């Protein structure tokens, strides 16, 4: 199945703006410029997020603000706002959807860091590292509860149903990841299902619910859902590639951290096709150190695993563009296209 997907990916045209060596900083600026006209509304979202994570309990507030202030691209809120422009855009309504989805994402990060025993997130200590696992778990739970309370301000039964189904799927994705740690026998289907549940669905629903909350036609919000889904799949695959090709400074965590924590990603699945590498990869376990992993990472980079994974990411990105082209032309569509292009080129 890996070969079939790779052949399909390589048969699609490559996305290019004529400058494949775009500087990381310039690329990041292009990403932010794609939605700069929404900066005032993004500020509204930031204030709402800060207010939502605050609690009467100082420790909860401190932990929540610690994660919030670590930064992040806020891709999900941006997708909510841009998708809302396909209907009757009202920031005072749509902000609740944007905050809800970012809070769910943040809660999943806190829980992820406990599961993976991660010390760093975006270059700063994780909540579990700064406090402990119990504080981290309850902070994540508090954020999830806060997100659900926020969503009650939207009187859209369909949106509530979609959101509840998505949360169930996200939880299943987390459970699958725990179950498959250090399992080098898993297949591509398992990996794709896991990244769909852990990443792609939340981005897909960000696009869909933004449109639903603004009263957009069903045809539009369904197309936006699939655009978000394909972008989300591409985004996670790029994330998994960067775990090998980026630097600790850019990642904000050790290179190869996913593999060290036992998470088998697409580059690893391709690398497993190399018999010698497969034997080395199967020896990785919870006792493996960063120093022991470094030569294996270098060997993976020497194979075609990174290139093959990039081809699959680009295949999903092309599918996203195909869905986007069915939507009405305008500023929102142009911005979504620019963001999707950025995702295919991002370096961190």
Curated annotation (Swiss-Prot):
Pfam families linked: polyprenyl_synt
InterPro entries: GerC3_HepT, Isoprenoid_synthase_dom_sf, Polyprenyl_synt, Polyprenyl_synt_CS
SUPFAM superfamilies recorded: Terpenoid synthases
Binding site for Mg(2+) 2: 112, 116
GO molecular function, one term: heptaprenyl diphosphate synthase activity
Reaction catalyzed: 4 isopentenyl diphosphate + (2E,6E)-farnesyl diphosphate = all-trans-heptaprenyl diphosphate + 4 diphosphate
Signal peptide boundaries: none
UniProt keyword Signal, yes or no: no
Highest taxon, organism lineage: Bacteria
The protein's Enzyme Commission number: 2.5.1.30
Similarity remark: Belongs to the FPP/GGPP synthase family.
Name of the protein described by the UniProt record: Heptaprenyl diphosphate synthase component 2
Organism: Bacillus subtilis (strain 168)
Record gene name: hepT
